[in-house]
């Protein structure tokens, strides 16, 4: 009887302990490889930025009191996101192609879940009175870019197409805010970037002399939502709901009737609406906000891996086998009735037949 009572007591204690564990809140840590103006915890230009500003993840788990969403925006961009993954401080993150490939090459256990911010154009702005009117004029000049980001690789590809390499220019490693300050004060001669440069030009503080928009599509930048493999394997149902939320944000961000509201939402980042209008001019929202892991996207990542190593930005070969994990995306698209909502593209950049 004593043994039975002891066993019952242990079972009860274990049950209470297990119940307490079950009630422990789960915090889903979501990172973003950028930060808003004046360090605002928002960004723009991607469906992931919409998910944050529109609280899509928070709404997805609104009826789950033990699940919390915690966003972190990184001034250090993609390289800082890799540190977060390496230290198990992030479960999901929006991240550009080059840093995510570097993370893969260095052994980070992640999975690519959906595209977000794919096909983003790159801009080149020159300081006023710099005498720079074309890419070839950059030789020997001080040029700002943020090392280790997808803009870094895109900039090198643009330079190479015009007969230059990274050693032909004086690279100054600056984040977005630093670039704006240095270009305005003319401490640098030119800079690669996007909306912050469009904004400077609109104020008359710099001149846009080039953009990849309308040029070779291989010069553009890609990005996506990356997940930590250990979290995905431990919480597949929650991972599915996270992807569902991102897909819903992508759908809303792709609807042309939402264009004005979308830019107003992204304005939470501090980027003026007219700048966003220019950034997305001549592009459909669906083209820029598609979450699809199609042949074009995969081929672009493969090319970025090869080019990244060739340019010395990635030290090892990048094994992409098994990295792309489309099953959660495909499930979301099927259940949300979005099978033909976005156009998929082949590796040659041409649309797939419907």
What kind of region is each of these model predictions?
Residues 172, 178-270:
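Pocket-lining segment of extracytoplasmic ligand-binding domains
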Residues 127-142, 233-237:
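Flexible hinge/capping segments at coil-to-helix
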Residues 94-106, 156, 161, 188-207, ...:
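A ligand-binding cleft/hinge motif common to bilobed small-molecule-binding domains
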Residues 36-68, 106, 158, 300-303:
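Short, polar/charged alpha-helical segment
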Residues 24-48, 67-73, 140-144, 170-172:
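Short, well-ordered beta-strand elements
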Residues 306-354:
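Conserved C-terminal helix/tail region of periplasmic/extracytoplasmic solute-binding proteins
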């Amino acid at each position: 009887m004593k043994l039975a009572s002891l066993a019952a007591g242990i079972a009860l204690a274990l049950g209470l302990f297990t119940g307490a564990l079950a009630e422990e809140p789960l915090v889903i840590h979501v990172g973003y490889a950028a930060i808003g103006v004046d360090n605002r915890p928002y960004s723009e230009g991607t469906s992931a930025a919409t998910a944050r500003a529109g609280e899509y993840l928070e709404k997805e788990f609104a009826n789950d009191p033990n699940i919390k969403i915690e966003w972190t925006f990184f001034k250090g961009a993609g390289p800082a996101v890799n540190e977060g993954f390496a230290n198990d401080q992030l479960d999901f993150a929006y991240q550009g192609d080059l840093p995510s490939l570097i993370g893969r090459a260095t052994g980070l256990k992640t999975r690519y879940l959906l595209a977000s911010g794919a096909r983003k154009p790159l801009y080149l702005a020159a300081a006023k009175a710099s005498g720079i009117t074309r890419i070839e004029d950059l030789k020997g000049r001080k040029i700002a870019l943020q090392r280790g980001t997808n803009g870094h690789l895109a900039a090198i590809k643009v330079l190479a197409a015009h007969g230059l390499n990274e050693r032909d220019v004086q690279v100054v490693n600056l984040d977005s805010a630093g670039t704006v300050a240095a270009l305005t004060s003319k401490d640098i001669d030119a800079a690669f970037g996007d909306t912050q440069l469009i904004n400077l030009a609109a104020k008359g503080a710099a001149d846009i002399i080039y953009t990849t928009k309308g040029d070779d599509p291989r010069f553009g930048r890609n990005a996506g939502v990356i997940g930590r493999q250990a979290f995905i394997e431990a919480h597949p149902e929650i991972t599915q709901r996270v992807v569902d939320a991102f897909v819903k944000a992508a759908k809303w961000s792709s609807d042309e009737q939402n264009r004005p509201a979308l830019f107003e939402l992204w304005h939470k980042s501090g980027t003026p609406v007219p700048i966003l209008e220019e950034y997305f001019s001549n592009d459909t929202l669906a083209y820029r906000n598609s979450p699809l892991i199609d042949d074009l996207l995969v081929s672009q990542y493969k090319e970025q891996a090869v080019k990244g190593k060739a340019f010395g930005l990635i030290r090892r070969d990048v094994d992409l086998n098994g990295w792309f994990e489309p099953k959660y995306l495909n499930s979301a698209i099927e259940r949300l009735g979005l099978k033909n909502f976005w156009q998929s593209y082949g590796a040659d950049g041409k649309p797939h037949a419907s």
